[in-house]
Every structure is written in C-alpha cells, then in structure tokens.
Amino acid sequence: MPVSIEELKALQVQKKEASKPKFISKAKRAEMAAKAKQIQKNTTSEETTLKDIRSTTDLKRSVVQETVETTKPLPSKPKPKSTSGKFSFDWSAADDTSKAYQPSYSIDSGDGQVPKRQKRDLEDAHWSDKPVESMTSRDWRIFKEDYSIVTKGGGNIPNPLRSWNECKEIPGIVRDTISRMGYKEPTPIQRAAIPIALGIRDVIGVAETGSGKTASFLIPLISYICELPKLDERSKVNGPYGLILAPTRELAMQIKDEAVKFCAPLGFKVVSVVGGYSAQEQALAVQEGAELIVATPGRLLDVIDRRLLVLNQCCYVVMDEADRMVDMGFEEQVQKVLASLPSSNAKPDSDEAENLAAVSTRRYRQTMMYTATMPVAIEKLAKKYLRRPGIVTIGSAGQAGSTVTQLVEFLNTDEKRKRRLLDIISKRQYRPPIVVFLNYKRDCEAVSDALVAAGWRTAIIHGGKQQEQREQAVQHLKRGAVDVLVATDVAGRGLDIPNVSLVVNFQMANNIESYTHRIGRTGRAGKRGTAVTFLGQEDDDVLFELKQMISRSEASPNNQELSRHPAARMKKLQQ
C-alpha cells in the first residue's frame, strides 16, 4: 500500500527535528569530563601505551565535538578489518572531521617564529623608526633620496647626519650652542657636508640658495679650532686659524654676525676684513688676536700686500659663493690669497687625502668650497686647490630652490613694467619685505620714485651707495621700516633677509647664474616665495636657459609665450 502524503510530511518533520543541534548543559559536560578523568585514572601503568594516548585524545575530541554539535551516541567498537581489500576509516562517514581543528594549536610555544617576525618588522621599518646602528645601506639610500642628497668622492664618504645629537664628533659645547641658537633639525646641506668636513676631508658643496650653507661650514670649522691651542701673545702674530672668503661686503658681514654667535661662547674672536672700513683698524684688530677672519678677496689681498696681516698658521679655508667671486672677476685675487697660505700644511694629492687615519697624523690644511652653480672656472679652481674633495650636491646644481614659484611676463617698455609692478604689489597678495632687482643704478631711482608716489616705503642699494648707507637700508628692511628694497645685483648674493615673499626682476639678469641668485632671496629656509620676471627683446640670449630652468621647477607653471618664443627653442652659441 503506498505511503500517504500525511505520512511523508510527518517523516520530514521528524527528520528536521532530528537534524537540529542539541547542546549539552554545563552540568552534563562536567559529568562527562569527570567520567573521562576517572577512566584515565583507573588505567594501569602497564596499559599506558600509544593506544591509550590515542584513546584519551579521541575521548577529549568527542567532548569538544559534543559541545558544538548534536548529541551523538557513544562511539561504537572499532570496525573489524575489512577482508574485501577496501580501506575502512575509524570514523563514520557522517562525522565532520574539521570541526575540532584549531590552527593556533599547531604552533608550539617557543618555536622562534615571533622573534623572527620582530626582526623582519625592524628590517621593514622606515629609517626614522630605527636607531642609527640598525640603518642598512638601503636605509641610507632612501634617507639621501628623501633629502635630495647626492655625494661623490670615493668610498670613504661618511653617512649623513640624522640629528645633531647623533654626531658625537661635534664638541659638546658646540652642540649646546647649536641648541641655544634654535637649530632644531639639520638642513640637507648640513646633514651631508658636516660629517665629511669633520672627517678632515676637503668639501665642495653645491646647494641651492637659502639652504643653510653658512652653518654647514661654520660648525666643522669651529669644531676644528676647538682642538687647537688657545692664541697667546706669541702665537697671535702669526695670524688666524681659519679664513672665510666671500664675494661681497654684505655677505661677509652676514657670515661674521653668524660666526660671532658660535664663537662668543667659546671665547673665540672673529674679525672682518672688507672694503668700506679702515684697513689699518681691521689689521690692528687681527694683530690683537683673532681665531677667525671673514674677508672679501680684494681687501684681504691688499692687507696682505701691505704686510699688515700674515696667514702663517691658517689651516682652515672656506670659499663661500665661489662662483660669484669668479663672475665678479676675483678669481686672480682668490688665487693670490690661497698662494699666500703656507705650503707646508697642504694635503698630498693622493689616496692619503681620503684616509682619515692618514691625514689625522698631521695637521693638514682643510679647504671647503661652496657654490650654487658649477661652471668650468670653478671646476678648475677646485682641482688646483682642493685635494680629493667630497662633493655634496643638494637638488640640481644651478637650479633655484623648489620653494620658489617662477613667473615671467613679456613687457617691452619701462612704463608698462612700472604699471605692472604696482598692480602686482597693490593687490596685497605679497606682504613686505619685497625686493625689486634692476641692472643699472640710474633705473633704481626711477622705479623707487614710482613706488614712493604709490605710497610704498622704499630703500635703494647699488654700487654708488656708501657701505654705511647699504647696511642701513638692509637693516630698515629687516626691521619693517621699509616695504620694498630696490637693488642692483650687489644685493643679489648672500643677503639673508627673512621672510621675503616676492622678488621682481624689473630687468632680467644678464646670465642665468645671476638670475638664480636673485630669486634665491625668497623661498628661503623652507618657506615658499614667488619670483616675477619682466622680459623684453634684450633678453633673447638667456631665454633658452630660463625656459629650461622653469621647466625643471615643480613649483613653477610653464609659460606658453616663453615656450613658443624663437629664442627659447635653441641655445644661442657663444661668439
């Protein structure tokens, strides 16, 4: 007789009820665990074999399974060995054998995996999260890329500075001075150049303007002087221990002011030898004893020729902005000054000059040269007077800082340029101080008059001004008594005027090097700045290099009119 529909439904309900999981109560589980424990306790020592261990494990597994699964009858006796040749498992086909599997149980404690992972994590960490001892060659490569540092000069170039405290070669009293002066973190040129110089290596530093070059040579120079005997009545007549050459009076005085901050706590004396002041007074100050002299090449050579100063014990020489000294025609004077240094302490031009152990046995003269560009004349000068130098390049040689936005406009007449200049600064987008550059003294007065008529406070610097007038103009600009500085290229190099927001090249510089140094008055010390350049027909010779320079600057937009200009498409051949 066929099964009715009601019976089929009833069977389905029964199967459904039977398939529902049934959980064992806590008391029941405790009872089963007690039974298992009692069974294990009652086994004799003779039966403690591999079979007993397996049975106990199976029993524990059954407890876990019964906690999360349906209640099952106690395991049946093992099936007899099949005689049919077919393999028979010890468990039922309905059993879920993966339920009790826990991956974490498979790793034994103390297998060494955690220490290995910690070591791997340290290796994968960023260099800023590692102690300096754990830095790998890969970490140092990334570090240099982060700060746009490129070093050359053999295999003995030391790694850059990560922080001031990690450089134990700097005397403690100098590190204290660095801290008091507010130097938080080294700049890229300081990170790279200072360790090389402290290793008694000659250094060539090629860095963008406003990059912190001054401290990068003052710190190793003063650290070097700290190791020398104090000047006394007998030794001071032999001249200074250190010499710094700068192309302009303004830059020399600026370096002197910075050097005094470092030297005063150490009891060292700094004297400037520059034009615009009495040579006799300056020579007398040197003869009274000075560990460090900051000078311009022309005035220093004049004092040496008049036998008012000797450099018999000068063992540390710095040439700052060497390319500018060459551009200004001081190359011959620089060479004469260097020739007046004692030849007895010159380094050998051999591998020994790269070996710290070798050069530390004698007190050889150390030379540092800093430049923003690397023309052929500078390469020749370096080859003649520096011995196996370590070369540090920050960014690209001859390129303005990445913090300067460079803009150009084609305006052919001075009247159009004056109106545009007033239009730019009257929008108050750029806050004072502002610097306006021109090529000729006579034009400075006209531009200044136009600015004054529009209500701006101005100061003028050019070669026709007395030294005192030029210094006063710069001080007024720094104090905020003046809004706009109108200047020729005499102020284009070295002057560190804080927070210049805008540079306007009312007339384009005659060459790309001067342009680089002009716009370097803004965007200094990591701050952003803008440089606007007015162009005319007279600037065709520099348009190609100007276009190339702007195109390499990530902060500057490409100017379509400049890009399409015929003179900007091909570099003009030198006559």
Swiss-Prot record:
Q: Which reaction does it catalyse?
A: ATP + H2O = ADP + phosphate + H(+)
| GO molecular function ontology, one term from the record | RNA helicase activity
Q: Where is the composition biased (Basic residues)?
A: 566-575
Question: Where, by residue number, is the motif Q motif?
Answer: 163-191
- One Pfam family, short name: Helicase_C
> Keywords on this record?
ATP-binding, Cytoplasm, Helicase, Hydrolase, mRNA processing, mRNA splicing, Nucleotide-binding, Nucleus
Q: Region labeled Disordered — which residues?
A: 35-130, 552-575
Specify residue ranges for compositional bias: Basic and acidic residues. 48-63, 120-130
The entry's cellular-component GO terms read: catalytic step 2 spliceosome; cytoplasm
Query: Where are the compositionally biased (Polar residues) regions?
Result: 552-561
Q: Which InterPro entries match?
A: DEAD/DEAH_box_helicase_dom, Helicase_ATP-bd, Helicase_C-like, P-loop_NTPase, RNA-helicase_DEAD-box_CS
Enzyme class, top EC level, equals hydrolase
> Helicase ATP-binding domain spans which residues?
194-392
- Cited PROSITE patterns: DEAD_ATP_HELICASE (PS00039), HELICASE_ATP_BIND_1 (PS51192), HELICASE_CTER (PS51194), Q_MOTIF (PS51195)
Location of this chain's protein in the cell: Cytoplasm; Nucleus
Which PANTHER family did the record assign? ATP-DEPENDENT RNA HELICASE DBP3 (PTHR47958)
Q: What is the protein name for this chain?
A: Pre-mRNA-splicing ATP-dependent RNA helicase PRP28
Q: What's the source species for this entry?
A: Yarrowia lipolytica (strain CLIB 122 / E 150) (Yeast)
List the taxonomic lineage: Eukaryota, Fungi, Dikarya, Ascomycota, Saccharomycotina
Gene this chain is encoded by: PRP28
